[in-house]
């Protein structure tokens, strides 16, 4: 797995593990998400990844209000992480 993909997958796993139940937790989540959003293009400008990753990084307020959307986005991210890890096990 290339360094950029490893960075992204690790950060997504970390973001998925952060608490997300109160307004202050959502605000803290956004702060971490913004850091990732800054670092990705700075460190890995050519990294390609699914468009849904940006929605995940930007839509925490919607996930906080809509449990169905939260489940959908979290599943999209865990599926992406699993797919990337599986592809690299085979390679």
Regions found by a protein language model. Give the residues of each.
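Alpha-helical repeat scaffolds in large eukaryotic proteins
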Residues: 13-20, 34, 58-61, 85
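Amphipathic alpha-helical binding modules
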Residues: 52-91
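Short terminal alpha-helical segments
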Residues: 1-31
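Short acidic/histidine-centered micro-motifs embedded in hydrophobic/aromatic stretches
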Residues: 11, 32, 52, 56
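Charged, low-complexity interaction regions
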Residues: 19-27, 41-44, 62-67
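Short, well-ordered alpha-helical segments
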Residues: 42-56
């Amino acid at each position: 797995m290339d360094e950029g993909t490893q960075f992204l997958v690790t950060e997504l796993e970390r973001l998925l593990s952060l608490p997300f139940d109160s307004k202050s937790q959502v605000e803290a989540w956004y702060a971490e998400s913004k850091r990732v959003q800054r670092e990705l293009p700075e460190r890995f400008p050519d990294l390609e990844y699914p468009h849904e990753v940006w929605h995940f990084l930007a839509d925490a307020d919607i996930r906080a209000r809509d449990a169905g959307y939260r489940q959908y986005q979290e599943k999209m991210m865990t599926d992406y992480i699993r797919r990337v890890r599986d592809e690299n096990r085979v390679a």
